[in-house]
Regions:
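A generic transmembrane alpha-helix motif of multi-pass inner-membrane proteins
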Residues: 232-246, 276-335
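Membrane-interface loop-to-helix entry segments
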Residues: 3-7, 11-43, 239
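Alpha-helical transmembrane segments
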Residues: 188-202, 226-233, 252-277, 333-334
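Hydrophobic alpha-helical transmembrane segments of multi-pass membrane proteins
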Residues: 6-13, 73-84, 172-183, 217, ...
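Hydrophobic alpha-helical transmembrane segments
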Residues: 2-5, 108, 205-210, 244-245, ...
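Membrane-embedded translocation segments of transport machinery
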Residues: 24, 28-186, 196-210, 214-215
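Hydrophobic alpha-helical segments and their helix-loop junctions in multi-pass secondary transporters
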Residues: 35-59, 127-131, 218, 222-223, ...
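Transmembrane alpha-helical segments in integral membrane proteins
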Residues: 2-19, 84-99, 179-194, 252-259, ...
Length: 335
């Protein structure tokens, strides 16, 4: 609980300031530090016995799962979360850019650096898994777990077997996780912060106080006895079904209602590389079509595997979000 309080106080202290003096300054420090820490971990992991086994596992494709809907849902959720797609974060940050910004260039830099960092980090993760597999005699496939299981179960076990090196590498690894979590939380909070300020005329400090207070109360549910189960359900819904559905909806709105063809000139302005008809086709037809297929088969698979409780919780979350959104909109009308 103390850790939760400290984290939310840090988030509040940073978010109550203006973008450049708050998130901007913190990101300039935490993001480079995150890269330096992960670089140290990756370089060290490549010196461990068995690292080649882990890298071989990472780079060896398993074509048998190519048509597994859960693989595609996991891939979508990973890239959506890491690039903060469909959550108004990019839109919020873009509103601060000057008129002559090279949008396409910026997008390419963000996507390339994000994907490059993830691949770079994966070499370190699988090298450490290879080391554990060799030293413990357990097949590496049995060590690979998702999300919190990998971070808070597998890696602590690995670090405990490393002796002095693990005592150095372990704190660095979890410090990197902390930095990544704080910067992600700040990013998720910023669109809500701007919306509250614009809709209700609150100061940034007051808006940050309200949102961080609500966030803290909600976070308390994830510290109870069933926290891991709640995290699994909420994370699976938000990253795999909720956000995926919103992105498909955004494609329809921007592609068919608002007229994405009119945005090409704005997007291409001042950029070295340009988008054209192919980009429009992807937004209007290909992306929503693929998402709809994956989303539908994902729901069917969830029902077939008996995930009725998970689906029920997901429905409750969805209805809660919709009701809260409608209530806030109505409240704005009567303010």
């Amino acid at each position: 609980m103390a850790g939760l309080v400290i984290v939310w106080v840090m988030i509040w202290f940073i978010s109550k300031k203006e973008l450049n003096s708050g998130i901007g300054k913190v990101s300039k420090v935490l993001i480079p530090l995150l890269f330096v820490i992960m670089a140290a971990i990756v370089i060290f992991s490549l010196t461990l016995p068995g690292h080649n086994l882990g890298i071989e596992t990472l780079l060896t494709p398993d074509w048998s799962v190519l048509f597994d809907v859960n693989i595609w849902l996991a891939a979508f959720s990973q890239i959506i979360f890491s690039l903060s797609l469909g959550m108004a974060i990019a839109l919020t940050y873009a509103s601060y850019l000057p008129e002559d910004s090279k949008l396409i260039n910026n997008v390419l830099i963000v996507v390339s650096s994000n994907s490059g960092f993830e691949i770079f980090t994966a070499f370190g993760v699988f090298s450490i898994l290879g080391f554990m597999s060799v030293t413990s005699g357990v097949p590496i496939e049995s060590l690979i777990r998702q999300g919190t299981g990998l971070v808070f179960i597998v890696f602590p076990t690995i670090f405990n077997t490393m002796g002095i090196a693990g005592k150095i590498l372990g704190p660095l690894f979890f410090l990197a996780i902390l930095f990544a979590g704080i910067t992600s939380a700040l990013g998720f909070l910023e669109p809500l912060l701007n919306s509250v300020c614009d809709k209700f005329g609150f100061t940034r400090k007051k808006s940050a106080s309200i949102l961080c207070g609500v966030g803290f109360v909600i976070s308390m549910f994830f510290t109870c006895g069933i926290s891991s189960y709640l995290v699994e359900i909420v994370d699976g819904f938000l990253n795999q079904f909720g956000i995926l559905f919103l992105i498909a909806l955004q494609c329809i709105i921007f592609g068919w209602i608002l007229g994405i063809d009119d945005l090409i000139e704005v997007v291409n302005k001042d950029s070295v590389m340009h988008v054209g008809k192919l980009w429009v086709t992807i937004i209007k037809y290909i992306l929503p079509g693929v998402i709809f297929i994956v989303w539908t088969f994902g729901i069917i698979d969830l029902i077939k595997t008996g995930g009725f409780l998970e689906l029920a919780v997901d429905v409750v979350i969805t209805l809660s979000i919709l009701i809260a959104s409608v209530m806030l909109t109505k409240f704005e009308d009567y303010k």
